[in-house]
């Protein structure tokens, strides 16, 4: 049997989504706009990075070719030399959302065919009966925020009042989410998690995808900083995913980063977390070392999204891509005959785009494996093709959604 490694660069879209206009995202392209900014010197930052976007290892897997597949336009920012056993293509999402659970579930073979619940962009954003229940059942003196807002901004705005009053900061966005920020010391981390579990139960009837604990530290608006003790409380997938199918067979699924939270810990054998992309990469490499035949390592690199996409930090996003790319040879070196490595994304978050929210984009599907023929897998009509390919590679029977491209890259289950 073989092994599979699925690395999700959270929010690393490549434009071209056929339905982008419906979301107000026509023209959004995370990769292309970062590359353009770098080429024009607009992403230079002293002691961080300079010059054109330099990601030679992802380019050698066909990232530029994937970008051309996504948009139908040329992509001149990378060279065209590809390694022999690499494959490249792009995928269009069929799930209605442009959020983290929808993207990851679809990657794992389960498109989201229902509509998530959302909160309106009003003040207050939450229904009065929900707010009352949160206060009563969560045993808090009230809540702050109750609106749409970027996370760092709302902590700056309400953090000091939160410390004085003990009221948690509750907010939302265009995603199906209710986020709760609280101070790790003054409110307490365990208390925040307990409050989020109460809220998770209360919003279940509203089909809200995630309740997210957003702890922070600091004593003033100028010093507040979110920590890496974030925890997502997600709705469980409504039917088995690739992860469930693997663990039911007896294979291990090692979740790196927030993968366990995204799947409500369904189909997960082990969770490995760390703070920051580079520490997460260390965890992914360790999981690769420990994976046995038939196992899947599923890793999410969240900083691209939370630290740079939402914050519209082009230089930071570019530097993070370059740092990630520099580590890829360490992953390549761990691949053995019969292994499959796929790099992809779950949605876009163009740091040059208006607002602070995700962008509807196609995603790259690039990768390699010793013994594979590689090649062009074209435009996949659903992210679920990724999950089906991993399933076939690991010897599972076909699932209900998606079409494997395993044969196209010369794979043999």
From Swiss-Prot:
Chief location category: cytoplasm
Keyword list, A-Z: Cytoplasm, Isomerase, Manganese, Metal-binding
Required cofactor(s): Mn(2+)
Alphabetical list of CDD domains matching this protein: PPM
Pathway where this protein functions: Carbohydrate degradation; 2-deoxy-D-ribose 1-phosphate degradation; D-glyceraldehyde 3-phosphate and acetaldehyde from 2-deoxy-alpha-D-ribose 1-phosphate: step 1/2
GO molecular function, one term: phosphopentomutase activity
GO biological process: 2-deoxyribose 1-phosphate catabolic process; 5-phosphoribose 1-diphosphate biosynthetic process; metabolic compound salvage; nucleotide metabolic process
InterPro entries: Alkaline_phosphatase_core_sf, DeoB, Metalloenzyme, Phosphopentomutase_DeoB_cap_sf
Coiled-coil intervals, chain numbering: none
Residues involved in Mn(2+) 2 binding: 305, 310, 358
Pfam families per record: Metalloenzyme
EC assignment: 5.4.2.7
GO cellular component terms, semicolon-separated: cytosol
Residues at which Mn(2+) 1 binds: 10, 346-347
Class of enzymatic activity (EC top level): isomerase
Subcellular location: Cytoplasm
Reaction(s) catalysed (UniProt annotation): 2-deoxy-alpha-D-ribose 1-phosphate = 2-deoxy-D-ribose 5-phosphate; alpha-D-ribose 1-phosphate = D-ribose 5-phosphate
Cofactor stoichiometry and binding remark: Binds 2 manganese ions.
Family to which the UniProt record says this protein belongs: Belongs to the phosphopentomutase family.
Function noted in UniProt: Isomerase that catalyzes the conversion of deoxy-ribose 1-phosphate (dRib-1-P) and ribose 1-phosphate (Rib-1-P) to deoxy-ribose 5-phosphate (dRib-5-P) and ribose 5-phosphate (Rib-5-P), respectively.
Protein name: Phosphopentomutase
Gene encoding the protein: deoB
């Amino acid at each position: 049997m073989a092994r599979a490694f699925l690395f999700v660069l959270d929010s690393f879209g490549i434009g071209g989504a056929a339905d982008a206009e419906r979301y107000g995202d026509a023209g959004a392209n995370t990769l292309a706009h970062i590359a353009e900014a770098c080429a024009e010197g607009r992403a230079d930052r002293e002691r961080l990075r300079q010059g054109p976007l330099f990601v030679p290892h992802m380019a050698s897997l066909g990232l530029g070719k994937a970008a051309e597949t996504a948009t139908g336009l040329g992509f001149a920012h990378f060279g065209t030399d590809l390694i022999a056993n690499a494959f490249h293509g792009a995928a269009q999402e069929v799930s209605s959302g442009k959020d983290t659970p929808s993207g990851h579930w679809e990657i794992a073979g389960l498109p989201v065919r229902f509509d998530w619940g959302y909160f309106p962009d009003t003040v207050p954003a939450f229904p009065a009966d929900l707010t009352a229940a949160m206060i009563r059942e969560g045993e808090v003196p009230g809540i702050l925020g109750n609106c749409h807002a970027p996370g760092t901004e709302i902590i700056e705005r309400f953090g000091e009042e939160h410390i004085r009053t003990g009221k948690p900061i509750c907010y939302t966005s265009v995603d199906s989410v209710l986020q709760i920020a609280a101070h790790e010391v003054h409110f307490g981390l365990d208390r925040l998690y307990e409050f989020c579990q109460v809220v998770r139960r209360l919003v279940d009837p509203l089909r809200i995808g995630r309740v997210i604990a957003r702890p922070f530290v600091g004593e003033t608006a100028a010093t507040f900083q979110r920590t890496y003790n974030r925890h997502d409380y997600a709705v469980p997938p409504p039917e088995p995913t690739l992860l469930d199918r693997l663990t039911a067979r007896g294979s291990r699924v090692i979740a790196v980063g927030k993968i366990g939270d995204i799947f409500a810990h369904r189909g997960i054998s082990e969770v490995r977390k760390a703070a920051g992309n580079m520490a997460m990469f260390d965890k992914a490499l360790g999981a690769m070392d420990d994976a046995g035949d038939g196992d899947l390592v599923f890793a999410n690199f969240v900083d691209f999204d939370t630290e740079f996409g939402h914050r519209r930090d082009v230089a930071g996003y570019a530097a993070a891509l370059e740092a990630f790319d520099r580590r890829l040879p360490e992953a390549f070196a761990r691949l053995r005959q019969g292994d499959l490595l796929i790099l992809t994304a779950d949605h876009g978050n163009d740091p040059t785009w208006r607002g602070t929210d995700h962008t509807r984009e196609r995603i790259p599907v690039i990768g390699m494996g010793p013994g594979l023929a590689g090649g062009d897998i074209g435009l996949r009509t659903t992210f679920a093709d990724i999950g089906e390919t991993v399933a076939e590679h690991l010897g599972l029977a076909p699932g209900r959604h998606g079409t494997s491209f395993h044969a196209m890259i010369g794979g043999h289950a």
